[in-house]
């Protein structure tokens, strides 16, 4: 999972960074938070995390907190998917916290709905996939009030600031749910105006949803449009 996280870090130009644990601890996103000093600058990133002897993780400093929450659910989905593929199961769908991967031998594609963030049990889009995954990251999930401002758990690793726009969703389709999960987390940390252009430049299947009250705006990368049900 560390190796996959570093791959996603590279794919997002560093916007997905597993060394942001200290920022979340400082802001209060973890119940068992430690006492740490305010962080204004950092001299390390995910690039400084190394693996040796197969599974030995080496950190640049002892106080670096590795946070895998932005990729762990997708990784778990892939583990289950790979296990089920070894069994005589015709079709299955795995869903862990909204990170989904499907397999079907009965049909070429499986229809999935992308949830409407403003209404329960309704969809804003339908997609057709098979042996692929879709993962979604939202700034409206896991928020808290920090120094008088409502902030998201999503952190911009370039500025070390948590995203304050709580009306964003990013969905990514990829053959690996691990990668889709990490990409969605990294992309949503970017400036919203750059997400689709970055996705197009890097052939990422991305859907950006901006919502407020009952108003919804949807934007698609060219790669994502291949999966939209007409």
Predicted segments — roles?
Residues 1-230:
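Mature catalytic core of soluble alpha/beta enzymes
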